[in-house]
Structure formats: structure tokens, C-alpha cells
Amino acid sequence: MAALQEKKSCSQRMEEFQRYCWNPDTGQMLGRTLSRWVWISLYYVAFYVVMTGIFALCIYTLMCTLDPYTPDYQDQLKSPGVTLRPDVYGEKGLDISYNVSDNRTWVDLVNILHNFLEGYSPTSQEDNINCTSEKYFFQDVFGAPNHTKFSCKFMADMLQNCSGLTDPNFGFAEGKPCFIIKMNRIVNFLPSNSTAPRADCTFLDQHKDDRPLQVEYYPPNGTFSLRYFPYYGKKAQPHYSNPLVAAKLLNVPRNTEVLIVCKILADYVTFDNPHDPYEGKVEFKLTIQQ
């Protein structure tokens, strides 16, 4: 019992560890001979090569089932969201306020519109084609260069008085500002049966004079031409430009905060989703001081 309970000295422990690392009597290193180390190394190399090959084959098979022209992630909303320019946000959504007599309060708003419309200049649109039809522009084949599909031009001058060309101040200087409305893209979305969708802007709250909002729309009637639909995705239409509608507000009361809503009226566009205030419409506060 005394022999069993005898503790090994530090030198004995070190000697045993050295013999475990290399045993000259048996030729073992770390408990295995050289041939066994070679065999176990070959086993693990072969195992991981096979596992890597199986994983690569699974990824390749998965990628073959994916359509490169269909976005990986798509929203579940059936109707497109609607955005507004200029887009200045307050604590609770879009909140735009400026003073007609102080250009420092609206020069940034004008610059936002100019910068946004740079994407609709002749240079930016030179890769797109001129379209004249007012019907849907269906494309069953990739007829454009580099295995893509054609996109119709949308030029800034189509917004006429709200293009920034005839009036660089977009009406802000006279208290009749222009706002640009854009629908977000949804792949293969058709907004209506045969009638082009259009924008409709109204006061959302009541005023003491109870006058309806007077609006000039560009293009006329505030329509989004059907020739810009359907959208086939970024890879299929790399040069696609969203159609726009500009709304020039003519009778906004001064020194009063008003709430305005711009809805998209179309057969398959809804704007009554309580969970998404920007589906099918955009609301914003506007204060014009004088």
C-alpha cells in the first residue's frame, strides 16, 4: 500500500512525458509509430476532402435551382411603397418647413431635388430607349446588350414646370413648391389592368377655409405610364429608372402646418394598410411661412 501511495518525483514525471513524446525502444511518437501517423493523417485528409466535395456539390445544386434574375429577398407587400422628394424627416415622418422670404430655409430642399433629378438627365438615360407606347412593355427575351432587357427613358424635362429646367427653384420661392412622387420597384408588378396609375394629393386634415388642395401634376394627370412596367429586376434591367410624378401645390395656406397625403390610384395598389403608412401612399407635413 505504501508503494502504491508513493508519489512520483518531478524528474520521474518529466522522464515519462519525454518517453511519451518519443519512445526510442518502440519508435513511437506521441503514442503512435510513424506509419500509424501517416495512415491516420491520410484518413483525415481523405475524410475532409470527401466532406468538402459533398458540401460543394450541395451548394452547386442549390445555386443551379436559383434564378439569377430573381432577387434573393423580396418584400411581402402586394403594393409598392411610395417615396417623396425632397425627403426631410422630423420626429414623426416627413416634415417640411420653410420661409418663402428666406432662401436659406429652402435652398437645401431645392438642392435635394436637383441632385435627385441628375439620374434623369440625358447623360444618365443614354443607355435606355425611347418608348412611345402607353401599354405594358412585356419582354419575353433578353434582347438588350449583355443579356439584359430594355428600359424606357424617363427624362427630367417630362416634369415640365417641376423639372428644375424652367424654374430652378421648383416653385419654392413663390410658395408653390414642387414635390416629386416615386413608387418603389416590385419585380413583375402590374399596377392595373389597362389604366395607368396616377397620383392624387389632398389635404388630410380640415382647414378653416375648407378649400380643397389645388395641384398641377406633371406628366399631365399625374400618371405613371404603363410602359415602365413590369420591372424585371436589377440584373435584367441594370439601367432602369423609376417613372416619376411631380405635384406642384398651388394653394397651401401660409403660416399653418398642413398634413398632405399623396395616394397612388390603381387597380392593384392599396393604401389602407395600418401597419405600413407608406404602402400605396405617402403622407407629409408642410409649413410655408411668409
UniProtKB/Swiss-Prot annotation:
Coiled coil: none annotated. Pfam families: Na_K-ATPase. Keywords: Cell adhesion, Cell membrane, Disulfide bond, Glycoprotein, Hydrogen ion transport, Ion transport, Membrane, Potassium, Potassium transport, Signal-anchor, Transmembrane, Transmembrane helix, Transport. The lineage of its organism: Eukaryota, Metazoa, Chordata, Craniata, Vertebrata. Disulfide bonds join C131-C152, C162-C178, C201-C262. The ATPase pump is composed of two subunits: alpha (catalytic) and beta (regulatory). Interacts with alpha subunit ATP12A; this interaction is required for the formation of a functionally active pump and targeting at the plasma membrane. Interacts (via N-terminus) with alpha subunit ATP4A (via the P-domain). Residues 194-290 are annotated as: immunoglobulin-like. The gene is ATP4B. It is a single-pass type II membrane protein. This is Potassium-transporting ATPase subunit beta. Glycans are attached at N99, N103, N130, N146, N161, N193, N221. NCBIfam families: Na_K_ATPase_bet. The beta subunit of the gastric H(+)/K(+) ATPase pump which transports H(+) ions in exchange for K(+) ions across the apical membrane of parietal cells. Plays a structural and regulatory role in the assembly and membrane targeting of a functionally active pump. Within a transport cycle, the transfer of a H(+) ion across the membrane is coupled to ATP hydrolysis and is associated with a transient phosphorylation of the alpha subunit that shifts the pump conformation from inward-facing (E1) to outward-facing state (E2). Its main location: membrane. N-glycosylation is necessary for assembly and functional expression of the pump at the plasma membrane. The C-terminal lobe folds into an immunoglobulin-like domain and mediates cell adhesion properties. It comes from the Eukaryota. Belongs to the X(+)/potassium ATPases subunit beta family. Residues 58-290 are extracellular. GO terms for biological process: cell adhesion; intracellular potassium ion homeostasis; intracellular sodium ion homeostasis; potassium ion import across plasma membrane; proton transmembrane transport; sodium ion export across plasma membrane. Residues 1-36 are cytoplasmic. The chain crosses the membrane at residues 37-57. GO terms for molecular function: ATPase activator activity. GO terms for cellular component: apical plasma membrane; sodium:potassium-exchanging ATPase complex. It is found in: Apical cell membrane; Cell membrane.
